[in-house]
């Protein structure tokens, strides 16, 4: 069994799917740890090509020998809610100004998609988490 590599740093980048380039924010974030930036960009773009148009977070682990691994997460709940509601962005004052609405069915669909990344035991709890995010963005939740 090969010896384990020593983990130096773990961080998350939210990047457009299939469009990672060595320009900021990718270049500086990886460059300061001595990681091969082009290698990351090529593998990230290849793995996220099918999700173009979404923001896909990547959790990157950098090791002592300057190698790296990354795990793709699901798109942020806020992005999925904006897409479901069909609005440009959330409200600046969500408790006073509502910018759109989402249905319970849409919430459940988003919760199913996000379930792996949420700290929830079942789908109902995940749906409540997503509903809270929707309310904090100025979206009404309708039945």
Swiss-Prot record:
Can you tell me which residues the record assigns to a coiled coil?
none
Extract the HAMAP family matched here. Ribosomal_uL11 (MF_00736)
Q: Which GO terms describe its molecular function?
A: large ribosomal subunit rRNA binding; structural constituent of ribosome
Q: Which GO terms describe its cellular component?
A: cytosolic large ribosomal subunit
PTM (free text): One or more lysine residues are methylated.
Protein name stated in the entry: Large ribosomal subunit protein uL11
* GO BP of this protein: translation
Q: Provide this UniProt record's keywords sorted from A to Z.
A: Methylation, Ribonucleoprotein, Ribosomal protein, RNA-binding, rRNA-binding
Q: Which organism is it from?
A: Salinispora tropica (strain ATCC BAA-916 / DSM 44818 / JCM 13857 / NBRC 105044 / CNB-440)
Similarity remark: Belongs to the universal ribosomal protein uL11 family.
Which PANTHER family does the entry mention?
60S RIBOSOMAL PROTEIN L12, LARGE RIBOSOMAL SUBUNIT PROTEIN UL11M
Q: What role is this protein assigned?
A: Forms part of the ribosomal stalk which helps the ribosome interact with GTP-bound translation factors.
User: What interactions and quaternary structure are annotated?
Assistant: Part of the ribosomal stalk of the 50S ribosomal subunit. Interacts with L10 and the large rRNA to form the base of the stalk. L10 forms an elongated spine to which L12 dimers bind in a sequential fashion forming a multimeric L10(L12)X complex.
């Amino acid at each position: 069994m090969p010896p384990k590599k020593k983990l130096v740093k773990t961080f998350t980048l939210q990047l457009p799917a299939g469009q990672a380039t060595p320009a900021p924010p990718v270049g500086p974030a990886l460059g300061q740890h001595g990681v091969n930036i082009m290698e990351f960009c090529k593998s990230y773009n290849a793995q996220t090509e099918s999700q173009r148009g979404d923001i896909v977070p990547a959790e990157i682990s950098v090791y002592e020998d300057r190698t790296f691994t990354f795990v793709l997460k699901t798109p942020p709940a806020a992005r999925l809610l904006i897409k479901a509601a069909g609005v440009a962005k959330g409200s600046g004052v969500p408790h006073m100004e509502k910018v759109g609405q989402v249905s319970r069915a849409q919430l459940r669909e988003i919760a199913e998609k996000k379930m792996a990344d949420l700290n929830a035991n079942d789908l109902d709890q995940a749906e409540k988490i997503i509903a809270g995010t929707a309310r904090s963005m100025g979206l009404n939740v309708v039945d």
